[in-house]
Amino acid sequence: MTTAPQPSTWRKIFSRKMLICIFTGFTSGLPLYFLINLIPAWLRSEHVDLKTIGLMALIGLPFTWKFIWSPVIDLVRLPFLGRRRGWMLVTQIGLLLTLLIYAFLNPAQHLYVIMGLSLVVAFFSASQDIVLDAFRREILSDEELGLGNSIHVNAYRIAALVPGSLSLILADLMPWHNVFIITALFMLPGLLMTLFLAKEPDIPPSVSRTFAQTVSDPFSEFFSRKGIKQAILVLLFIFLYKLGDSMATSLATPFYLDMGFSKTDIGLIAKNAG
């Protein structure tokens, strides 16, 4: 009995599914690096103090705590585009619009608005990560998962070059207003992917569950597995383990600026080579 020939690696790489993985990685990485690279550079350029910029690292908490509302996104089906693509579209439109709002803000006058807006961006970005991860897992077979995830992660890293390099270079050439508009428009490829390239996964319906079951059962199981004390320790670890790294990352670009490097220097060297 002969087995069917397997497609070559190159054919797998240049398939529709892997192209989608490029888009999911890029559109997932852009908002995160916008927050941790571009916003601190902008704030320091506008003479915001380092203490405030360091505290801005707390806006990354939605990325750590997204497991809390992920059951809701998994259960609630929006009335357009399907279970996954509907949420993808909502989060991507939300990100595009919120990133554009920065173009009309001034840290000297709207610092607290910027903090609140950054928290909203983090929430939309974390929610997008939830649905993109689920979507990618459902469209990829077990054999395709390794390649698809590696492509996704590499595209995620490439996305860092937009707010972390290109936008910083542009900030030396044009007003921040224009920089934010250009950076926000890089969300459009992911949005177009959702509308025209991605197809809703053909997944058979699972056993019907109530909203309460979907939301409460995972937490009940988590707290009952090894007791409340152990669960709280795990949650504290999740909350704290990235906090120091996040604060250090958010202060890296302001540190370079204070040392006298231009934004072009930082964009070309620290963010590209580093």
Place the predicted regions along the sequence by residue.
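Juxtamembrane intracellular "pre-TM" segments in multi-pass secondary transporters
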Residues: 2-14, 201-234
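Helix-loop boundary and gating motifs at the non-cytosolic
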Residues: 5-63, 230-237, 241-255, 259-262, ...
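Glycine-rich segments within core transmembrane alpha-helices of 12-TM secondary carriers
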Residues: 63-66, 146-171
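Transmembrane alpha-helix termini and helix-breaking/packing motifs in multi-pass membrane transporters
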Residues: 71-76, 103-104, 161-181
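A membrane-interface helix-boundary motif in multi-pass transporters
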Residues: 81-88, 112, 169-186
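C-terminal ends and interior cores of transmembrane alpha-helices
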Residues: 88-109
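Symmetry-related core transmembrane helices of the 12-TM Major Facilitator Superfamily/SLC fold
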Residues: 90-97, 177-196
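Cytoplasmic helix-loop-helix junction between adjacent transmembrane helices
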Residues: 120-155
